[in-house]
C-alpha cells in the first residue's frame, strides 16, 4: 500500500517539474529569438 501510493505521488511531481522546466526553457528561447528576429528583419 505505501509503495503503491508513493509511486503515483512521485510521477506527477516529476511531470510537473519537467513541464515547468520546458516552459521556462521555451520562454527563455523565445525571449532570445524575439529580439534576434526583430533585429534581422
From Swiss-Prot:
One of its GO terms (cellular component) is photosystem II reaction center. It comes from the Bacteria. Its main location: membrane. It is a single-pass membrane protein. Pfam families: PsbL (PF02419). GO terms for biological process: photosynthesis. InterPro entries: PSII_PsbL, PSII_PsbL_sf. The chain crosses the membrane at residues 20-40. It is found in: Cellular thylakoid membrane. Keywords: Membrane, Photosynthesis, Photosystem II, Reaction center, Thylakoid, Transmembrane, Transmembrane helix. The keyword Transmembrane applies. The keyword Cell membrane does not apply. HAMAP family: PSII_PsbL. One of the components of the core complex of photosystem II (PSII). PSII is a light-driven water:plastoquinone oxidoreductase that uses light energy to abstract electrons from H(2)O, generating O(2) and a proton gradient subsequently used for ATP formation. It consists of a core antenna complex that captures photons, and an electron transfer chain that converts photonic excitation into a charge separation. This subunit is found at the monomer-monomer interface and is required for correct PSII assembly and/or dimerization. PSII is composed of 1 copy each of membrane proteins PsbA, PsbB, PsbC, PsbD, PsbE, PsbF, PsbH, PsbI, PsbJ, PsbK, PsbL, PsbM, PsbT, PsbX, PsbY, PsbZ, Psb30/Ycf12, peripheral proteins PsbO, CyanoQ (PsbQ), PsbU, PsbV and a large number of cofactors. It forms dimeric complexes. Belongs to the PsbL family. This is Photosystem II reaction center protein L.
